[in-house]
Amino acid sequence: MVIKAQSPAGFAEEYIIESIWNNRFPPGTILPAERELSELIGVTRTTLREVLQRLARDGWLTIQHGKPTKVNNFWETSGLNILETLARLDHDSVPQLIDNLLAVRTNIATIFVRTAIRNHPEKAQEILAQAQTVDDNAESFTALDYGIFRGLAFASGNPIYGLILNGLKGLYTRVGRYYFSNPEARKLALTFYSRLSTLCDEKAYDQVLDCLRAYGKESGAIWHSMQGTMPSDLAEARR
């Protein structure tokens, strides 16, 4: 395995995660004893202990006092925070993972965007107005797009939607930087934000669903046209 982490803790974390992913430490099995594992990885037991606690919080492991550390089935025990890790571990699956990410965003947005526009129209308009001053580059549009969806999620009155968007931020941002490098993607997004603003003004709440689905379909078509030239390091973390 190729591990790029620079710190001992980062190295140990990547080593264990990749070992779980590659079934060196299969789900359901017991992790090697602390002394053995620290020697195997080449880190101190103190560093290893900190890493194991962090991996347990992320759902990779189960640690119980007086019992061996168990490897979890991370699909069942982890949260959205491991999306970037999964994308980095399996480059071949990145397009499908991103398709799933975008589908989730569209599906939940049909609920929270409509609710935000209906129940808190002034706040929704304030959020959408950010699109009027955005710089025409990928970085700015990525921040804008995430900010609008996240802002409307919280404006819906149900903070759980906002927390879901928080969990998607890492991979969402990496994808956005590439997707919004396409001028057509930026143009489509501005049209979408403007349309939402109009629907908010007109109190046309029943049209929000169709607007979101149309945007999901059109932005998905642009995204699929870009997959052939997608950089191999799209999911790599900045270390």
From Swiss-Prot:
In its UniProt record, a GO molecular function of this protein is: fatty-acyl-CoA binding
Residue ranges the record marks as coiled coil: none
Q: What main location does UniProt list? A: cytoplasm
The entry's cellular-component GO terms read: cytoplasm
The record places domain HTH gntR-type at 6-74
Q: Which Gene3D superfamilies match?
A: GntR ligand-binding domain-like (1.20.120.530), Winged helix-like DNA-binding domain superfamily/Winged helix DNA-binding domain (1.10.10.10)
**Which InterPro entries does the UniProt record give?**
FA-response_TF_FadR, FadR_C, TF_FadR/GntR_C, Tscrpt_reg_HTH_GntR, WH-like_DNA-bd_sf, WH_DNA-bd_sf
Compartments, record wording: Cytoplasm
Q: Which residues bind DNA?
A: 34-53
| PROSITE patterns referenced in this protein's UniProt entry, alphabetically | HTH_GNTR
Share what the entry says about its subunit structure, partners included: Homodimer.
HAMAP family linked to this entry = HTH_FadR (MF_00696)
Q: Supply the name of the protein.
A: Fatty acid metabolism regulator protein
**Native species of this protein?**
Yersinia enterocolitica serotype O:8 / biotype 1B (strain NCTC 13174 / 8081)
